[in-house]
From Swiss-Prot:
Disulfide bonds join 31-55. Transmembrane segments: none annotated. Inhibits trypsin. Residues 22-56 form the BPTI/Kunitz inhibitor domain. This is Hemolymph trypsin inhibitor A. One of its GO terms (molecular function) is serine-type endopeptidase inhibitor activity.
Length: 56
């Protein structure tokens, strides 16, 4: 929980996304932190780990 920016259909950042995290887009962020996250990678058509840099 709390790993991703909420999808557009969630009205508040305080709401929790309860769906499959692998269907969320890979959002790497613009900062330089290095957090491991998971999301759907259309290039490989599967859920994959990626590095999230923080900040939106």
């Amino acid at each position: 929980a709390g790993l991703y920016k909420p999808p557009n259909n969630i009205e508040s950042e305080n709401e929790v996304y309860t769906g499959n995290i692998c269907f969320l887009p890979l959002e790497v962020g613009v900062c330089r932190a290095l957090f491991f996250r998971y999301g759907y990678d259309p290039a490989i058509k599967a859920c994959x780990e990626f590095m999230y840099g923080g900040c939106q």
